[in-house]
Amino acid sequence: MRRYSALPGGGARPDTLADRLHRYRGVLLVILAPLALVSLVLLLMPRSPASSSAAAGRRWGPLDANKYAVIFDAGSSGSRVHVFRFDANLDLLHIGDQIELFVQKKPGLSEYANNPQEAAKSLVSLLEDAKRVVPVELRGQTPVRVGATAGLRALGAEKSEEILQAVRDLLREKSSFKTQPDWVTVLDGPQEGAYEWVTINYLLGKLGKTYADTVGVVDLGGGSVQMAYAIAEKDAVKAPKPSEGEDSYVKKLFLKGTTYYLYVHSYLHYGLLAARAEILKAGNGKGYSYCTLEGHQGQYKYGNGKFEASASPSGASYSKCRDDVVKALKVDQACTHMKCSFGGIWNGGGGAGQKNLFVASFFFDRAAEAGFVNPKAPVAKVKPSDFEKAAKRACKLNLKDAEAAYPGVQKDNIPYICMDLVYQYTLLVDGFGVGSHQEMTLVKKVPYSNAFVEAAWPLGSAIEVAS
């Protein structure tokens, strides 16, 4: 029965909504109070990261919420495997207690130049390490790439292809990972340099910002050295055309909604180990070297070559060694472009993208071994002049004293510690035009998400294949 309220003058009117709410306010209070309390608790609870299924719905299916990538870095000084785990937004996730799996072994594939099958077998233990951390149900959809760098490039097309084919066969027969023939390849130098640039800027959170906010990267490997930094579009269009057989100077990248024009060049034969051969050849007329330490006798072997490396009767000389290094770098070679680094190569023009410079790989290793950076620190601020000071100290030593002074240096590298440090200083200052007192960041690992990630090109490759 519908209830009515009395109207003025004795008539009746229907109950209004306000009347009914007032009449049942007690019942409403009993119902709404618990609901309000539950809502408040949910609102105040700390937010946890998106669940696997929620993350998966944004990009991949539920089984793919955690996506893995296995990248082999087949360098001239050794082989390394990196395993990365990503979420649906392509952010790195931990693998156990670490942000990545990283395992390395020596020697590199190029040491098996005449035995491709043994070269492939040298990767088996690394492959097993990778399999252990990737869940069985995800292995079939986990890509595995092998990128060989300067060491294999130096062997020539025929020998390097024989080794690569043996590696492809190994992955097809022994691996449960997803693989394709073109995922096992010799990386060209610019691709290696571009991946390295992507890796470091990704880890620093620079991608998506203007080119002036990014950092430049110099990566000194064993067989080659790469310089990469972002330049303005107006400078990119002015880039000289490369000579026949050379790689383009500029790569166009689209990363996190931003277009970058990346100057990148790889200098083959100027990685630390390959440069030793070039320096010894530059001073070869004497029959000895001013760059090797007093007391050393013998030859230096690199690739398929042997180079006279016996020390001068008077021992090493910083200034005379530097002359040989400048000669090896061909600093005075004619420059047909606007600005050149060394060997007549265009240097990209400089600019804001090069001002904040990160230098990696052998730069960090030799600095740590020479004692002017903490070997356990992931990054360190240095100047090229630090390499100069360390070189002058090293060049004064004989072989025996150097072994005592540098306990962290492998015995095979002791005779070349003067040469290596002179080369690194000269490469930076005379080769790349870095000011002697310009501050740089030596980087081995980059802080990321309460962890440290190896500053190497494989992460850039993993980002590409997992995208």
From Swiss-Prot:
It is a single-pass type II membrane protein. Its cofactor is Ca(2+). It catalyses: a ribonucleoside 5'-triphosphate + 2 H2O = a ribonucleoside 5'-phosphate + 2 phosphate + 2 H(+). The active site is at E192. Residues 1-25 are cytoplasmic. Its main location: membrane. ATP binds at residues 70-80, 216-226. Keywords: ATP-binding, Calcium, Hydrolase, Membrane, Nucleotide-binding, Signal-anchor, Transmembrane, Transmembrane helix. Its EC number is 3.6.1.5. It is found in: Membrane. One of its GO terms (biological process) is nucleoside diphosphate catabolic process. It holds the Pfam family GDA1_CD39. One of its GO terms (cellular component) is membrane. GO terms for molecular function: apyrase activity; ATP binding; nucleoside diphosphate phosphatase activity. It is an enzyme of class 3 (hydrolase). CDD domains: ASKHA_NBD_AtAPY1-like. Residues 47-467 are extracellular. The chain crosses the membrane at residues 26-46. PANTHER family: ADENOSINE/GUANOSINE DIPHOSPHATASE, APYRASE 2-RELATED. Catalyzes the hydrolysis of phosphoanhydride bonds of nucleoside tri- and di-phosphates. Belongs to the GDA1/CD39 NTPase family. This is Probable apyrase 2. It comes from Oryza sativa subsp. japonica (Rice).
